[in-house]
A protein has these predicted regions:
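Conserved alpha/beta-domain cores
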Residues: 2-157
Length: 157
C-alpha cells in the first residue's frame, strides 16, 4: 500500500503560550513547527494554551512550515488538546507516551469525528507517535501501523 508522506526532516518545538517564540518561529526554516501544549506549558496555563492553538497555528505557518501540536497525557488532557487542535492549519498531532495500538486507534477515532464535524477531509490530520517507554518500543511495529494517519514516530520523547 502506498500513501503520500509529508516531508518532515526538521521539527522545531515552540511553546504555544510563549509569544516571543511563536512570533519568530515562521522565520526559522523548519519543515514542521510543533506547537507544544504538553511539557513546556505549566499545568495552570494549559486551558489558556489550548485557546491559542488555532490562532498560533496560522501564525507559525506563514513561512510555509507544516504545524503539529504535541498533546498531553492522560487521556482527559489529550481529548481537550485534540479538540483544540483539529483545524485546517494544523497538519498533525504528536501523541505523547504512546502505550499501544488501542491508544492510537482511540485517538484516531476522535480525530476523525472532529474532522467530520468541522467539515475537514477525513485524514487531514496526521500523527506522530512518541515512543517513550521500553514497553512501547517493543510494540513499535504495531503502533506505527495502528492507523493510516501515523506518518512518523520518535523515540525518547
Amino acid at each position: 500500500m502506498y500513501r503520500e508522506l509529508p516531508v518532515w526532516r526538521s521539527l522545531m518545538y515552540v511553546p504555544v503560550n510563549v509569544e516571543k517564540f511563536v512570533d519568530k518561529a515562521h522565520t526559522r526554516g523548519a519543515d514542521v513547527i510543533q506547537l507544544d501544549v504538553e511539557d513546556s506549558v505549566p499545568p495552570a496555563e494549559k486551558a489558556n494554551a489550548r485557546k491559542l492553538v488555532e490562532k498560533n497555528a496560522a501564525r507559525v505557518k506563514r513561512g510555509g512550515a507544516d504545524v503539529v501540536v504535541r498533546i498531553n497525557q492522560p487521556l482527559s488532557l489529550a481529548v481537550r488538546d485534540i479538540e483544540a487542535s483539529i483545524c485546517p492549519d494544523v497538519n498533525g498531532i504528536a501523541i505523547t507516551k504512546v502505550s499501544g495500538v488501542s491508544h492510537v486507534q482511540l485517538l484516531d477515532e476522535l480525530v476523525s469525528e472532529l474532522e467530520q464535524k468541522r467539515g475537514m477531509t477525513i485524514g487531514h490530520t496526521k500523527c506522530i507517535g512518541m515512543i517513550e517507554t521500553p514497553e512501547a518500543f517493543f510494540k513499535i511495529r504495531d503502533i506505527t501501523t495502528a492507523c493510516s494517519r501515523m506518518v512518523a514516530c520518535n523515540i525518547g520523547g
